[in-house]
């Protein structure tokens, strides 16, 4: 069986496992106050060119989204997201569970449009009844998006400008951030994210770690953020588990080098599929490939290759997601191309 269902099929990079083993019997303080977390924070600040940033480690992506959003919104506010945003469709109502509405806008290749965002907020405040409505209090985007697409620096600057104008924090979900930064042709860097967002996170779960995300607040975390992490059940007593992993990932550029493997293998797959005449549902420059397959083709591949179901295209076709990762081998890629 060839596994291309997602980018978290594998465990962790061997260097992380080695460091976890080497440090296993060291006695350190808990809850993220250990020296490994401190070292990882400094390395992340340096990578972001943001020495004053507050860096917090959280166990997973949905936990990060819920806690960040809940910590930065007032009770009468909601968060604006693309209709295809992860918080809008694939987190089981986790944001709504905290009492905050997800206010959706149309997606454009998975992205929010700054002009539409400005129009939404301007229309809200122009309504004489807006005190009876959920206030747009924050903006959520992801990079890469659910479709593997990327924002340009200009697009981020435009969103940033709207958020500044209306005093709304801009939050960037970076569950797959490594793959976005490694993509060919991107003009967005970690330093840009530190400059243009109020909070973003660096995904580890999908980029080489066993688990964990590094949440970066360029201008400081909200008051009592750690307490909210604890309250939501996402504060690990053995915080070293996350600190060690990110310390390794941000040593000698490992996070960025392993991300490039996902891009290289995805590009080879795309070239192979294109040569065979396959239809692409979306042009993604990152590690996620979306193909439109005939249902009969999909049935024939069952038991031979594992893909992620995305959506029904029509009565006879299905959109599937094929994902590469930091660990995908080129021989697996060639085997899939041959199989297809």
Segments from the language model and where they lie:
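Hydrophobic beta-strand scaffold residues
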Residues: 102-103, 170-172, 280, 307
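Conserved C-terminal alpha-helix-loop-beta "cap" of PLP-dependent enzymes
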Residues: 74-76, 267-268, 272-340
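Conserved N-terminal alpha-helix of the aminotransferase class I/II PLP-enzyme fold
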Residues: 13-61, 83-88, 94
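Catalytic PLP-binding core of fold-type I/II PLP enzymes
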Residues: 151-183
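PLP-dependent aminotransferase-class I/II
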Residues: 99-144, 151-158
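Active-site C-terminal subdomain of aminotransferase-like
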Residues: 108, 135-136, 142, 150, ...
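Conserved PLP-anchoring active-site segment centered on the Schiff-base-forming lysine
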Residues: 71-89, 118
């Amino acid at each position: 069986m060839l596994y291309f269902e997602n980018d978290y099929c594998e465990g962790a990079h061997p260097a992380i496992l080695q460091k976890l083993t080497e440090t296993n019997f060291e006695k350190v303080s808990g809850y993220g106050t250990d020296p490994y977390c401190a070292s990882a924070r400094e390395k992340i600040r340096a990578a972001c060119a943001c020495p004053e940033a507050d860096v917090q480690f959280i166990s997973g992506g949905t936990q990060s989204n819920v806690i960040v959003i809940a910590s930065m919104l007032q009770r009468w506010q909601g968060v604006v997201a693309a209709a295809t945003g992860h918080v809008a469709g694939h987190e089981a109502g986790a944001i709504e569970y905290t009492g905050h509405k997800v206010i959706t806008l149309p997606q454009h290749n998975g992205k929010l449009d700054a002009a539409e965002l400005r129009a939404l907020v301007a229309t809200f405040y122009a309504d004489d009844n807006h005190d009876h409505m959920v206030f747009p209090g924050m903006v959520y985007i992801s990079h890469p998006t659910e479709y593997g697409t990327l924002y340009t620096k200009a697009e981020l600057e435009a969103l940033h400008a709207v958020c500044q104008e209306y005093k709304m924090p801009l939050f960037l979900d970076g569950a797959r951030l490594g793959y976005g930064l490694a993509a060919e042709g991107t003009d967005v860097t970690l330093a840009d994210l530190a400059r243009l967002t109020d909070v973003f996170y660096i995904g580890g779960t999908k980029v080489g770690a066993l688990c964990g995300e590094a949440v970066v607040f360029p201008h400081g975390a909200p008051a009592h953020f750690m307490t909210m992490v604890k309250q939501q059940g996402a504060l690990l007593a053995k915080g070293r588990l996350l600190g060690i992993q990110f310390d390794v990932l941000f040593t000698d550029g490992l996070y960025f080098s392993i991300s490039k493997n996902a891009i290289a293998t995805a590009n080879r797959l795309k070239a192979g599929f294109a040569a065979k005449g396959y239809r692409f549902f979306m042009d993604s420059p990152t590690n996620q490939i979306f193909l439109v397959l005939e249902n009969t083709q999909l049935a024939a591949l069952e038991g031979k290759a594992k893909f992620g179901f995305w959506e029904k295209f029509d009565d006879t076709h299905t959109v599937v997601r094929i994902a590469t990762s930091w660990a995908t081998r080129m021989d697996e890629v060639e085997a899939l191309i041959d199989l297809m």
